[in-house]
Design a protein with these regions (language model features):
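Repeated scaffold domains used in trafficking and secretory/extracellular systems
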Residues: 1-6, 44-52, 87-97, 134-145, ...
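Conserved core beta-strand positions within WD40 beta-propeller blades
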Residues: 11, 57-58, 101, 150, ...
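Residue position within the beta-strands of beta-propeller blades
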Residues: 14-15, 60-61, 104-105, 153, ...
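Short, solvent-exposed loop/turn segments at conserved positions within beta-propeller repeat blades
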Residues: 18-22, 64-69, 110-116, 154-158, ...
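A short loop-to-beta-strand structural motif that recurs across blades of beta-propeller domains
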Residues: 24-26, 70-72, 117-119, 160-162, ...
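Short loop/turn segments that connect beta-strands within beta-propeller blades
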Residues: 29-33, 75-79, 122-126, 165-169, ...
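A short beta-strand motif characteristic of beta-propeller blades
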Residues: 34-41, 80-85, 127-133, 170-177, ...
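Blade-level signature of beta-propeller repeat domains, shared across WD40, Kelch, NHL, RCC1
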Residues: 270-306
Length: 306
């Protein structure tokens, strides 16, 4: 996905060339009227935003996911590249609070006997400062937790969920339901806990890594072999959306009473986290619209240019 939403600083970063025909990486600040260009040089026309530091001052960009491409660290205020990290394959990288460290899972395929160790590097030197030596296949997600300056990431085999702490540089396994194969993990926008999703079950955990509640869609819905695959959040902590893969549906849950509604996505090619109690939807022609999770009202969206 070429769009990343920064809930803490109420910003959205996107590759405008992909959607609107203009080169560069852009930022929509929702406390200001217009979007501004962070990197406008044509040299960066193929670069995507990969991670955002929680302090809002640093972003990481690169050309391709899952390759040995350099990772560029960018100062958002100065709108310039401040450092380049070479010789690492960053898959779903995650920055710490200050943008001084980068965590990433690595390529792995248990069926081909390919294993990689999740690692953390110093953003200034590019030196590896922590690794997890565990032979398993890693999931395609990382979820930064601002409260603890940590990142959650999943594995295909038990333990299913791990946490890396940027301050102590330590890894730990998180106790989860062993019957659930985790597909996605997201930190709640109010930073009071996090969600994980797998086996058509959505689980909410508090900051002490204890389960608070769950919704079992296997029991509530006849999904006919289809899989709830990913979680998408807005800045409203009471609403969570989960995506039914191959089904073109969103299940939108109200966590106050655990009721939920369904929304037909139709021929959409993607969606993204967004602000103002909404998700951002992308159609086959790369037009953007917002979907209000409470009212299910959909409106066209085009960030105003500076």
């Amino acid at each position: 996905m070429s769009i990343i939403t920064d809930f803490t600083n109420r910003r959205m970063y996107f590759w405008r060339g992909y959607y609107f025909g203009k080169e560069g990486i852009w930022c929509q600040d929702f406390d200001k009227e217009k979007a501004f260009c962070v990197l406008k040089d044509s040299l960066y026309k193929d670069y995507l935003v990969r991670a955002v530091a929680d302090n809002g001052k640093t972003i990481a960009v690169s050309r391709n996911i899952g390759t040995n491409e350099p990772l560029l660290m960018v100062d958002v205020d100065k709108r310039t590249v401040i450092n380049t990290i070479f010789n690492h394959t960053f898959i779903y990288p995650c920055l710490d609070r200050e943008g001084s460290k980068v965590f990433s899972v690595t390529k792995s395929d248990i069926y081909k006997n390919i294993y990689g160790n999740p690692f953390c590097v110093d953003a200034q030197t590019g030196k590896v400062i922590a690794t997890l030596d565990e032979k398993t296949q890693w999931g395609n997600n990382t979820a930064y937790h601002p409260e603890s300056n940590s990142v959650y990431f999943s594995a295909f085999r038990q333990p299913n969920l791990y946490k890396f702490n940027f301050d102590t540089l330590t890894f730990s396994a998180v106790p989860t339901d062993k019957k659930i194969r985790i597909f996605d993990c997201k930190v709640a926008c109010d930073n009071k806990g996090y969600y994980y999703l797998g086996s058509n079950i959505l689980v909410y955990m508090n900051n002490e890594d204890k389960e608070v509640w769950r919704i079992n869609f296997k029991e509530k819905e006849k999904l006919n072999g289809k899989t709830l695959f990913s979680i998408c959040l807005s800045d409203h902590p009471d609403y969570i959306a989960v995506y039914l893969i191959d089904g073109e549906w969103l299940f939108i849950i109200n966590r106050n009473d655990f009721s939920y509604k369904k929304y037909k996505l139709g021929r959409r090619v993607g969606f993204s986290e967004f602000l103002n109690n909404s998700l951002l939807l992308i159609d086959k022609n790369y037009n953007l619209s917002t979907l209000n999770l409470e009212t299910l009202e959909e409106k066209p969206f085009l960030p105003p240019l500076a």
